[in-house]
């Protein structure tokens, strides 16, 4: 007679990753916290559902009350700081940390009222629910290092300096390259990062191209070749350039000879130009439809209204067409330390942090819709960050997603049979996929 079934192998793999990262030690062996973290990887749900999630696997859970007491401890005892230290030690165990990626997202709440933290602000999902801004700092492979939380109506540009300074202070870091998208590009941010002796690489807004490339347009017109790189300078503030457009050669940026500028790198791609042209054509067609009264004029580009009459802004369309295919980058790293190609490739590592956000918002469903106080929200994000670290560790080690790891191992159950009062445990027969996962993790298969 079958007495019980347990997905012991799945839990062992998750627990081993959690332990290898030093998370158990970081939280003082808090079993309830570990159960909340690992349960998120199996099935994203509320804390109150953790006993059910573990029960479905044939595993024993602590009580719901114990889980919520653990959340309170997470804030009282500084679990996040200890976890961040463990993750930093994991990342730097095999070498130094030279580059970090930063991005932000919004997490919304299905709530009727705002409070001090949960504010209605700009939402990437175009929602009007109260929300918080979450910033995530990861290494160049997308492994999480630090998470921050701000009021929902705070400008994204105001989040990067506090989280980077906190990270520097916590780990005694003096030299670091920070990579962020154009949303972080404010003059104050770049000056603050530079003052902190940090290097940065950020995306440039295309609207800067006419000024940065004024000499190129003067000498070459708007002709570019596929893969062309223009390494030049851009004003730190305003639009007044230190560039002498009467000289054809681009200046080599140096902080001493160009104190009012940063280094700017512009790259032209035929593939990007085709994509940009397609987008512009669609926008111009929409503008024409709005002018003709066929579509509603909500936020339409290339439409100008004068004395109540809507007209097509042909000059803006022509200006936009002259910039298709261009992508810009701003940095304070001199060419002697990093060539243009390396700056560009470093920036394009940003997809790792975007992937981490997708994991935390979709695979892990990080939205803390059930939490109502700042401490509870912060504790929830600590759980999410720990879960994301375990997920990234397993994904990097095996080359497959956490969702697939859970799917492959969940059905492999250890069965306990009661044979005339004698209890016999039977290990599951491993699939090829399960064997591959265990081999990649150097985890021995269960004994038969």
What are these regions (language model features)?
Residues 1-4, 8-448:
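Anion-binding and metal-coordination hotspots
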């Amino acid at each position: 007679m079958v007495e019980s079934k347990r997905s012991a192998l799945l839990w062992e793999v998750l627990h081993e990753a959690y332990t290898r990262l030093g998370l158990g030690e970081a939280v003082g062996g808090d079993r309830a916290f570990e159960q909340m973290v690992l349960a998120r990887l199996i099935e994203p749900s509320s804390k109150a559902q953790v006993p059910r999630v573990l029960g479905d696997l044939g595993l024993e859970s602590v009580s719901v009350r114990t889980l919520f007491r653990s959340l309170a401890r997470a804030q009282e005892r500084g679990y996040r700081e200890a976890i961040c230290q463990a993750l930093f030690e994991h990342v730097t165990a095999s070498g130094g940390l030279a580059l970090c990626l930063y991005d932000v997202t919004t997490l919304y709440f299905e709530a009727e009222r705002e409070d001090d933290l949960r504010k209605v602000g700009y939402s990437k999902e175009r929602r009007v629910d109260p929300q918080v801004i979450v910033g995530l700092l990861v290494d160049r492979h997308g492994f999480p290092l630090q998470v921050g939380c701000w009021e929902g109506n705070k400008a994204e540009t105001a989040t990067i300096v506090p989280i980077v300074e906190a990270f520097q202070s916590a780990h005694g870091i003096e030299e670091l390259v920070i990579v962020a998208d154009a949303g972080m590009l404010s003059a104050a941010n770049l000056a603050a990062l530079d003052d902190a002796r940090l290097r940065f690489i950020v995306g440039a807004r295309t609207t800067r191209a006419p000024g940065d490339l004024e000499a190129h347009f003067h000498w070459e017109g708007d002709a570019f070749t596929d893969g062309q790189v223009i390494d030049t300078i851009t004003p730190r503030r305003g639009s007044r350039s230190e560039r002498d457009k009467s000289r054809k050669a681009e200046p080599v940026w140096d902080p001493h000879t160009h104190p009012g500028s940063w280094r700017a790198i512009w790259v032209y791609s035929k593939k990007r130009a085709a994509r940009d042209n397609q987008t512009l054509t669609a926008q111009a067609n929409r503008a024409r439809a709005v002018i003709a009264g066929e579509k509603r004029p909500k936020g339409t580009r290339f439409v100008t209204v004068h004395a109540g009459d809507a007209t097509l802004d042909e000059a803006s369309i022509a200006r936009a067409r002259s910039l298709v295919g261009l992508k810009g980058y701003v940095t304070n790293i001199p060419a002697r330390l990093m060539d243009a190609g390396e700056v560009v490739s470093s920036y394009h590592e940003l997809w790792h942090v975007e992937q981490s956000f997708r994991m935390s918002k979709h695979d892990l469903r990080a939205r803390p819709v059930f939490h109502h106080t700042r401490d509870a929200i912060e504790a929830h994000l600590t759980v999410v960050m720990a879960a994301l670290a375990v997920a990234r560790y397993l994904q990097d080690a095996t080359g497959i997603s956490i969702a697939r790891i859970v799917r492959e191992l969940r059905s492999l159950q250890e069965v306990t049979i009661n044979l005339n009062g004698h209890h016999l445990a039977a290990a599951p027969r491993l699939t090829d996929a399960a064997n591959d996962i265990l081999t990649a993790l150097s985890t021995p298969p269960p004994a038969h």
